[in-house]
């Protein structure tokens, strides 16, 4: 059984037992988090929501919080002595999908 959920402005296909990394969620490590924005549930029969499937939820356990790889943003304008260098690390949350309830 699989489901398509929406979180952090992105849509993800998830299955039970799968590990996923999503945009940072306000949840404690070791706690459970429930996704209500379930767009589709598949298995023997497929349920497609418009826009969400009524009564469907996906439950996940919060493994840890972390930060992604560092990216460098560099702005430069030639002949004007303008240079700006800035780094960024996106925060994320690692989840393990426990159950898909449809």
UniProtKB/Swiss-Prot annotation:
GO biological process: translation
UniProt cross-references to Pfam families, sorted A to Z: Ribosomal_L21p
UniProt entry keywords in alphabetical sequence: Ribonucleoprotein, Ribosomal protein, RNA-binding, rRNA-binding
Residue runs in coiled coils: none
One GO location term (cellular component): ribonucleoprotein complex
A molecular function GO annotation: structural constituent of ribosome
Residue ranges crossing the lipid bilayer per the database entry: none
InterPro entries noted in UniProt: bL21-like, bL21-like_sf, Ribosomal_bL21, Ribosomal_bL21_CS
Domain of life: Bacteria
PROSITE patterns (UniProt xref): RIBOSOMAL_L21
NCBIfam families for the chain: L21
Job description of the protein: This protein binds to 23S rRNA in the presence of protein L20.
Record text on subunit structure and interactions: Part of the 50S ribosomal subunit. Contacts protein L20.
Stated family: Belongs to the bacterial ribosomal protein bL21 family.
Protein's UniProt name: Large ribosomal subunit protein bL21
């Amino acid at each position: 059984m699989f489901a398509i959920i929406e979180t952090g402005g992105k849509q993800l296909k998830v299955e039970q037992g799968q590990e996923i990394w999503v945009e940072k969620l306000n949840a404690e490590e070791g706690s459970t988090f429930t996704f209500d924005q379930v767009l589709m549930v598949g298995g023997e029969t497929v349920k497609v929501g418009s826009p969400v499937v009524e009564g469907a939820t996906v439950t996940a356990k919060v493994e840890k919080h972390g930060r992604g790889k560092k990216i460098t943003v560099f702005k430069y304008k030639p002949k004007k002595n303008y240079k700006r260098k800035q780094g960024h690390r996106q925060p994320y949350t690692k989840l393990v999908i426990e159950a898909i309830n449809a």
